[in-house]
Curated annotation (Swiss-Prot):
GTP binds at residues 265-272, 347-351, 405-408. Transmembrane segments: none annotated. GO terms for molecular function: ATP hydrolysis activity; GTP binding; GTPase activity; signal recognition particle binding. Signal peptide: none annotated. The keyword Nucleotide-binding applies. It catalyses: GTP + H2O = GDP + phosphate + H(+). InterPro entries: AAA+_ATPase, P-loop_NTPase, Signal_recog_particl_SRP54_hlx, SR_rcpt_FtsY, SRP/SRP_N, SRP54_GTPase_dom, SRP54_N_sf. Involved in targeting and insertion of nascent membrane proteins into the cytoplasmic membrane. Acts as a receptor for the complex formed by the signal recognition particle (SRP) and the ribosome-nascent chain (RNC). It comes from Haloferax volcanii (strain ATCC 29605 / DSM 3757 / JCM 8879 / NBRC 14742 / NCIMB 2012 / VKM B-1768 / DS2). This is Signal recognition particle receptor FtsY. Keywords: Cell membrane, Cytoplasm, GTP-binding, Hydrolase, Membrane, Nucleotide-binding, Receptor. Its main location: membrane. Residues 1-163 are annotated as: Disordered.
Length: 456
């Protein structure tokens, strides 16, 4: 069921995922190259910055020179004293020589803190091996350059303002989905939806929801881009499929008995068979039913519905061909009230919305019987034709819900997706075969999961 549409939706999911991942990887590679280039240039700048302060420092030998000058001054003073006091000459001379030797040793062996100054005084070139003080600034600058390459906005219009943002997100385990990533896949999805008989207005709504959900989003580290796209598709489909949805079983359970259901639609779409299927459906839930044949114009209509009634052991209310449909269904309601029957299932003649006389009959049934629910029946395989007919019937005589037959033969799913959004009235059941049990209660969530499930 709906396999063709399912494949198209999966193709869209894969296309978006591949496009986003490929562009993110390319942006990350480019940003990494930029970071490497910045890192390579950083050590040279660091060396230059380290050398300039050494050259600009004042000569560190000045304190020693001052010390030597002081020693010379002391020697001269000692010499004067020696001249004035010849008796102390020998001791003074010994003291001067000791001081001179001490100063000489001090000048020849500089303190550890003056190593750089000594190198500056002697003019020696610095060692080729970087010192511990030089390594740390180099690594810091390289790290800063790499971070800047990933986080700063790129002002080059040729690469796009989002390139580095995408690269940064990819580097942290995330992928940013940009509008350009969706342009081609969304166009292909739109064509796929239209080819699957999804109504134009519905297709546009689906695409707009996907844009809102995806553009500018980043996937979490715990999920894939495909999962993010699947979530957007899920929300977009669910929003259009679930319009007007209500709990059919609860509505029947809470309604005053007998509950009257009227079935309408064009000829040959399976209204009568659907009535028989619902009779079996209600029987399983413990409800009693009576069938009323309001299709009084079609030859053989009484015989067709009688076969179903006999097969299911149900009471049938019918008039002669050409009778008043409203009168037949009214008699069905009277019988249900008299025999404590829970539900009346009333058939009507197939008609087009342009058949004024037949549409007037529906209006009369509404006045005379006051049905609890009027259900539109059409074929799922009719696609957009079914959608348009549902719209027209709803405009002419308001419907409460729709039933799609032959859903098991429909690979497109366009009608199933579109009818609720177009009419504002929900799809309630899907016919999925010829047997009386071959009818499914329509569940929007289950429908979306079926469309987005993995290919078998």
């Amino acid at each position: 069921m709906f396999d063709g549409l399912k494949k198209k939706l999966n193709r869209f999911r894969n296309d978006v995922e591949e496009t986003a991942e490929e562009k993110a990887e390319a942006a990350a590679d480019e940003a990494e190259s930029d970071a490497d280039a910045e890192a390579e240039s950083a050590p040279a700048d660091t060396d230059n910055a380290a050398v300039e302060p050494e050259a600009s420092e004042p000569a560190a030998a000045d304190p020693d020179a001052d010390a030597v000058g002081d020693a010379d001054a002391g020697s001269e003073a000692d010499a004067v004293d020696a001249a004035d006091a010849p008796a102390d000459a020998e001791s003074s001379s010994a003291a001067v020589e000791a001081d001179a030797e001490s100063e000489s040793e001090s000048a020849a062996t500089p303190e550890p803190d003056s190593e750089v100054d000594a190198g500056a005084d002697t003019g020696d070139e610095p060692s080729g091996e970087p010192t511990a003080d030089e390594v740390e600034p180099r690594e810091s600058l390289a790290s800063d350059a790499a971070k800047a390459a990933l986080t700063e906005e790129d002002e080059d219009d040729s690469s796009g303002p989002g390139r580095l943002r995408r690269a940064a997100a990819f580097a942290t385990g995330k992928v940013v989905i940009e509008e350009e990533d969706l342009e081609d896949p969304l166009w292909e999805l739109e064509m796929a939806l239209l080819q699957s008989d999804v109504e134009m207005q519905v297709a546009e709504e689906i695409l707009e929801t996907i844009r809102e959900k995806l553009i500018g989003e980043t996937r979490k580290q715990v999920e894939s881009t495909g999962q993010l796209v699947s979530e957007a598709l899920h929300d977009a489909l669910y929003e259009v499929i679930s319009v007007g949805q209500f709990d059919f079983d609860q509505r029947i359970a809470e309604a005053d008995k007998p509950v009257t259901l009227i079935f309408t639609g064009i000829n040959g779409v399976g209204k009568t068979t659907t009535i028989a299927k619902l009779a079996k459906y209600f029987e399983k839930q413990g409800y009693s039913t009576v069938l009323a044949n309001g299709d009084t114009y079609r030859a053989g209509a009484n015989e067709q519905i009688r076969e179903h009634a006999e097969a299911l052991d149900k009471k049938l209310i019918a008039h002669e061909q050409g009778g008043d449909p409203a009168a037949v269904i009214y008699d069905g309601v009277e019988y249900a009230e008299a025999h404590d029957i829970d539900i009346v299932l009333g058939d009507t003649a197939g008609r087009l919305h342009t058949s004024n006389d037949l549409m007037a009959q529906l209006e009369k049934i509404d006045r005379v019987v006051g049905p609890d629910l009027t259900l539109f029946v059409d074929e799922a395989v009719a696609g957009q034709d079914a959608v348009e007919r549902a719209r027209q019937f709803n405009d002419a005589a308001a419907i409460d819900g729709a039933i799609l037959t032959k859903a098991d033969a429909d690979s497109n799913g366009g009608a199933a997706i579109s009818i609720a959004y177009v009419t504002g009235k929900p799809i309630l059941f899907l016919g999925v075969g010829q047997g009386y049990d071959h009818i499914e209660k329509f569940d929007p969530e289950q429908m979306v999961e079926r469309l987005l499930g993995e290919d078998e």
